[in-house]
Protein backbone atom coordinates (compact mmCIF):
# COMPACT_ATOMS: atom_id res chain seq x y z
CA UNK A 1 0.00 0.00 0.00
CA UNK A 2 1.30 3.45 -0.89
CA UNK A 3 4.03 2.21 -3.21
CA UNK A 4 2.63 3.95 -6.29
CA UNK A 5 1.20 0.95 -8.14
CA UNK A 6 -2.22 2.48 -8.74
CA UNK A 7 -0.61 5.78 -9.73
CA UNK A 8 1.27 3.98 -12.51
CA UNK A 9 -2.06 2.75 -13.89
CA UNK A 10 -3.43 6.29 -13.79
CA UNK A 11 -0.36 7.47 -15.73
CA UNK A 12 -0.86 4.78 -18.37
CA UNK A 13 -4.52 5.75 -18.75
CA UNK A 14 -3.63 9.45 -19.02
CA UNK A 15 -5.49 10.34 -15.84
CA UNK A 16 -2.41 11.90 -14.25
CA UNK A 17 0.63 13.62 -15.72
CA UNK A 18 4.13 12.26 -15.32
CA UNK A 19 7.04 14.46 -14.28
CA UNK A 20 9.47 12.70 -16.56
CA UNK A 21 9.70 9.89 -19.08
CA UNK A 22 7.46 8.70 -21.89
CA UNK A 23 4.54 6.28 -21.98
CA UNK A 24 3.55 4.78 -25.32
CA UNK A 25 0.29 2.85 -25.75
CA UNK A 26 -0.17 0.97 -29.02
CA UNK A 27 2.45 3.14 -30.70
CA UNK A 28 0.85 6.41 -29.58
CA UNK A 29 2.78 8.61 -27.14
CA UNK A 30 0.87 9.68 -24.08
CA UNK A 31 1.86 13.32 -23.92
CA UNK A 32 0.20 16.68 -23.33
CA UNK A 33 -1.75 16.36 -26.58
CA UNK A 34 -5.38 16.13 -25.47
CA UNK A 35 -6.41 14.30 -28.65
CA UNK A 36 -3.78 11.60 -28.03
CA UNK A 37 -5.00 11.16 -24.45
CA UNK A 38 -8.61 10.73 -25.57
CA UNK A 39 -7.63 8.26 -28.30
CA UNK A 40 -5.54 6.23 -25.86
CA UNK A 41 -8.37 6.12 -23.31
CA UNK A 42 -10.61 4.59 -25.99
CA UNK A 43 -8.10 1.75 -26.39
CA UNK A 44 -7.54 1.07 -22.69
CA UNK A 45 -10.00 -0.83 -20.49
CA UNK A 46 -9.89 -0.47 -16.72
CA UNK A 47 -10.90 -2.82 -13.93
CA UNK A 48 -11.00 -1.18 -10.51
CA UNK A 49 -11.09 -2.40 -6.91
CA UNK A 50 -14.63 -1.10 -6.70
CA UNK A 51 -16.83 -2.18 -9.53
CA UNK A 52 -18.39 1.22 -10.31
CA UNK A 53 -21.63 -0.23 -11.66
CA UNK A 54 -24.70 1.97 -11.85
CA UNK A 55 -27.11 0.54 -9.24
CA UNK A 56 -30.24 1.76 -11.06
CA UNK A 57 -29.31 -0.04 -14.30
CA UNK A 58 -29.42 -3.74 -15.10
CA UNK A 59 -26.24 -5.65 -15.82
CA UNK A 60 -26.96 -5.40 -19.56
CA UNK A 61 -27.61 -1.66 -19.38
CA UNK A 62 -24.34 -1.16 -17.47
CA UNK A 63 -22.37 -3.00 -20.16
CA UNK A 64 -24.23 -1.28 -23.04
CA UNK A 65 -23.81 2.30 -21.83
CA UNK A 66 -20.22 3.17 -22.72
CA UNK A 67 -20.45 1.39 -26.06
CA UNK A 68 -23.38 3.58 -27.05
CA UNK A 69 -21.97 6.82 -25.61
CA UNK A 70 -18.28 6.52 -26.53
CA UNK A 71 -18.23 4.12 -29.49
CA UNK A 72 -21.60 5.40 -30.82
CA UNK A 73 -22.97 1.88 -31.28
CA UNK A 74 -26.67 1.32 -31.77
CA UNK A 75 -28.55 -0.31 -28.89
CA UNK A 76 -28.80 -3.52 -30.91
CA UNK A 77 -25.06 -3.59 -31.67
CA UNK A 78 -24.23 -2.83 -28.04
CA UNK A 79 -26.55 -5.57 -26.78
CA UNK A 80 -24.96 -8.14 -29.09
CA UNK A 81 -21.46 -7.23 -27.90
CA UNK A 82 -22.59 -7.01 -24.26
CA UNK A 83 -24.11 -10.47 -24.30
CA UNK A 84 -20.98 -11.87 -25.94
CA UNK A 85 -18.77 -10.33 -23.24
CA UNK A 86 -21.11 -11.34 -20.40
CA UNK A 87 -20.97 -14.89 -21.76
CA UNK A 88 -17.17 -14.66 -21.95
CA UNK A 89 -16.97 -13.85 -18.23
CA UNK A 90 -19.58 -16.49 -17.39
CA UNK A 91 -22.45 -14.29 -16.29
CA UNK A 92 -24.76 -13.88 -19.31
CA UNK A 93 -27.66 -15.39 -17.36
CA UNK A 94 -27.60 -12.34 -15.06
CA UNK A 95 -28.06 -9.77 -17.86
CA UNK A 96 -31.44 -8.56 -16.61
CA UNK A 97 -30.70 -8.29 -12.89
CA UNK A 98 -29.45 -5.29 -10.94
CA UNK A 99 -25.97 -5.07 -9.39
CA UNK A 100 -27.34 -5.31 -5.83
CA UNK A 101 -28.60 -8.81 -6.68
CA UNK A 102 -25.07 -10.02 -7.51
CA UNK A 103 -22.17 -11.20 -5.38
CA UNK A 104 -18.98 -9.14 -5.36
CA UNK A 105 -17.30 -11.59 -7.73
CA UNK A 106 -20.22 -11.39 -10.13
CA UNK A 107 -20.17 -7.58 -10.01
CA UNK A 108 -16.45 -7.58 -10.77
CA UNK A 109 -17.02 -9.89 -13.75
CA UNK A 110 -19.72 -7.49 -15.02
CA UNK A 111 -17.23 -4.62 -14.69
CA UNK A 112 -14.67 -6.63 -16.68
CA UNK A 113 -17.29 -7.44 -19.35
CA UNK A 114 -18.13 -3.73 -19.57
CA UNK A 115 -14.47 -2.87 -20.15
CA UNK A 116 -13.99 -5.70 -22.68
CA UNK A 117 -17.09 -4.64 -24.63
CA UNK A 118 -15.20 -1.50 -25.60
CA UNK A 119 -12.69 -3.74 -27.43
CA UNK A 120 -9.61 -2.35 -25.69
CA UNK A 121 -6.10 -3.17 -26.81
CA UNK A 122 -4.88 -3.08 -23.21
CA UNK A 123 -6.62 -3.89 -19.92
CA UNK A 124 -5.50 -2.23 -16.70
CA UNK A 125 -6.51 -3.93 -13.46
CA UNK A 126 -6.14 -2.18 -10.12
CA UNK A 127 -6.29 -4.89 -7.46
CA UNK A 128 -9.48 -6.36 -8.94
CA UNK A 129 -9.79 -8.99 -6.20
CA UNK A 130 -8.98 -6.89 -3.13
CA UNK A 131 -12.62 -6.04 -2.33
CA UNK A 132 -13.83 -9.63 -2.73
CA UNK A 133 -14.53 -12.38 -0.25
CA UNK A 134 -11.93 -15.17 -0.51
CA UNK A 135 -14.39 -17.56 -2.17
CA UNK A 136 -15.08 -15.01 -4.95
CA UNK A 137 -11.44 -14.30 -5.84
CA UNK A 138 -11.01 -17.45 -7.92
CA UNK A 139 -13.84 -16.67 -10.33
CA UNK A 140 -12.36 -13.26 -11.17
CA UNK A 141 -8.82 -14.63 -11.49
CA UNK A 142 -10.13 -17.36 -13.83
CA UNK A 143 -11.58 -14.69 -16.15
CA UNK A 144 -8.27 -12.83 -16.12
CA UNK A 145 -6.32 -16.05 -16.81
CA UNK A 146 -8.57 -16.65 -19.83
CA UNK A 147 -7.82 -13.14 -21.08
CA UNK A 148 -4.09 -13.77 -20.69
CA UNK A 149 -4.35 -17.06 -22.62
CA UNK A 150 -6.19 -15.21 -25.41
CA UNK A 151 -3.31 -12.73 -25.65
CA UNK A 152 -4.92 -9.67 -24.07
CA UNK A 153 -2.26 -7.16 -23.06
CA UNK A 154 -2.77 -6.50 -19.36
CA UNK A 155 -1.17 -4.44 -16.64
CA UNK A 156 -2.34 -5.73 -13.29
CA UNK A 157 -1.72 -4.38 -9.80
CA UNK A 158 -2.13 -7.39 -7.55
CA UNK A 159 -1.09 -8.98 -4.31
CA UNK A 160 -1.98 -12.42 -5.75
CA UNK A 161 1.60 -13.55 -6.37
CA UNK A 162 0.69 -17.02 -7.65
CA UNK A 163 -1.63 -15.45 -10.20
CA UNK A 164 1.05 -12.94 -11.22
CA UNK A 165 3.57 -15.74 -11.77
CA UNK A 166 1.09 -17.76 -13.80
CA UNK A 167 -0.05 -15.10 -16.28
CA UNK A 168 2.78 -12.57 -16.44
CA UNK A 169 5.51 -12.13 -19.00
CA UNK A 170 7.09 -9.33 -16.99
CA UNK A 171 6.83 -8.34 -13.33
CA UNK A 172 7.59 -5.04 -11.62
CA UNK A 173 7.99 -4.89 -7.86
CA UNK A 174 7.47 -1.45 -6.27
CA UNK A 175 8.12 -0.09 -2.81
CA UNK A 176 7.60 3.46 -1.50
CA UNK A 177 6.97 4.90 -4.96
CA UNK A 178 10.05 3.36 -6.53
CA UNK A 179 10.52 0.43 -8.87
CA UNK A 180 12.70 -1.92 -6.84
CA UNK A 181 12.93 -4.84 -9.25
CA UNK A 182 11.80 -5.77 -12.75
CA UNK A 183 12.14 -8.94 -14.73
CA UNK A 184 10.55 -12.05 -16.09
CA UNK A 185 8.68 -14.33 -13.72
CA UNK A 186 11.53 -16.83 -13.94
Language-model segments: residues:
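ABC family nucleotide-binding domain
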Residues: 1-185
Amino acid sequence: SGSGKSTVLRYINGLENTDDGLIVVDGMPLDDNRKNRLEIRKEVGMGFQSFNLFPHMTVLENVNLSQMRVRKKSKKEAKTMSMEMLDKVGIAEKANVYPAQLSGGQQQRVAIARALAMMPKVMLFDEPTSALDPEMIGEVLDVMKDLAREGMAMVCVTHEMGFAREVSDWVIFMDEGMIVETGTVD
